[in-house]
Amino acid sequence: MTIFQRTIVVLIGTQLAASAVILFIFDLNSYNHFSGSFSWLHFLKELAGSFAFYLFSAGLFFLLIGLCAPSRKKKRISVHEKENSLK
């Protein structure tokens, strides 16, 4: 990947993850926190199969690809190879 492609993939991943975090916050705001019935475990179980969860997973996948994929290196022409090929 070139540096330009890596930058685009990282930006896409960041945007997807940020959108998912906003959706998580909206889901969390829909609960009444002052009642005794709120449970973090129940909230996380409901989020496990939601659209926001898959959106966040896709964002992390794009970030992983953008940050860990090896960059493409230019092929360098060696002068020594040309000298050896004439022999």
From Swiss-Prot:
Subcellular location: Cell membrane
Transmembrane segments: 8-28, 47-67
Keywords per UniProt: Cell membrane, Membrane, Transmembrane, Transmembrane helix
Keyword Transmembrane helix: yes
One cellular component (GO) term of this entry: plasma membrane
Superkingdom to which the source organism belongs: Bacteria
Topological relation to the membrane, as annotated: Multi-pass membrane protein
Major place of residence: membrane
Protein's UniProt name: Uncharacterized membrane protein YuzI
Native organism: Bacillus subtilis (strain 168)
Gene that encodes the chain: yuzI
